């Protein structure tokens, strides 16, 4: 597959161009320099060609992240057949632009200069200075207004090898890593991929954007999404927007890894568990930094986890140490098992045999001598498995009984570890004027 890297100094519009070419708002975009720190991959289609685009952090930023960002950019350049060098001619070339140009010449990749923020032909007067970069004729574009993008891609395609037309592929399993800042999400991602794809530091909030990384495990393709750490109260507008991007990444995911710090479990984990619960996606609780828990504190740590995460008690737990590579493969293996269950469908005949036996063996809610009667059960959706149960009185179903029933469905019907939804449909003389209720767990 063809690969193209997008580079440039901070705040020239690299992420805006990346988002425009990929076709959805993947990277955090704001008027603050240095918003993107990690190298982010996305897939674009151009005239039946699949191209991997890599959006890199702002180079020569002059801050504490400069060296780490440049190392990530150099990693992103490996395997790239061409480079889009984004500049802001309206602001004029800076010392950082020339530093980036010298760096690109040393790497020896084909370079196309994209003169961004040229919103109309009258701004073309700013282009003359760009010849001094030494990469030939620049392409005038506006990522914000989609101007000049075809011209840019034609120049890019001239440097790419011939590629076969797209062949339909099995969709990868998308997994989001969520957690509060500094619990080790990026370290886990790096441990899984055996590379330094995400910047890791002791300072909370290092990851500001949702970072997508493709990976293959056991013949299964994955897209691993390292999201920004979610705080109780965001400190800045950028953090607020990054949280929104994290929530959007969760919405597009198939599986959620809820990463918690084994040495520091608090009320914030409850909020994140609620977020995962509400998504209806399978959740794996990844208890990271497990190696730092003393033996005498193991039982207390488990007790705290049970208390904070009681409403997702069905979710499996994996105990990990990103530093020691402990439990890393278990995360992916468990995700594959849950994904298969999440997509499963149970025959109606099997469901109703189970329902009949259940009602014979187990007491049902009873109000004023009138018992709840469940007549029929069928699966109406997958991902997550959703079951409609036809009964005489939906209002007889208490929350406790419903949760109990959902747990038995998981255990008895091979759905352990995943969320299950129930829809109650009334049938019979009490149906008139009553509404079926829907529950989720």
From Swiss-Prot:
Put simply, this protein is called GTPase Der
Give the family this protein belongs to, as stated in its UniProt record: Belongs to the TRAFAC class TrmE-Era-EngA-EngB-Septin-like GTPase superfamily. EngA (Der) GTPase family.
User: Is Transcription regulation among the key words of this record?
Assistant: no
InterPro entries for this protein: G_ENGA, GTP-bd, GTPase_Der, KH_dom-like, KH_dom-like_a/b, P-loop_NTPase, Small_GTP-bd
Q: What does this protein do?
A: GTPase that plays an essential role in the late steps of ribosome biogenesis.
Give the matching HAMAP family: GTPase_Der
* An annotated Gene Ontology molecular function: ribosome binding
The record's keywords, sorted A to Z, are: GTP-binding, Nucleotide-binding, Repeat, Ribosome biogenesis
- Subunit: Associates with the 50S ribosomal subunit.
Q: Where does GTP 1 bind?
A: 8-15, 55-59, 116-119
GO biological process annotation, one example:
ribosome biogenesis
The record lists GTP 2 as bound by 179-186, 226-230, 288-291
NCBIfam families in the cross-refs:
GTPase_EngA, small_GTP
Give all residue intervals belonging to the KH-like domain: 344-428
One Pfam match: KH_dom-like
Domain (EngA-type G): residue spans on this chain: 2-164, 173-343
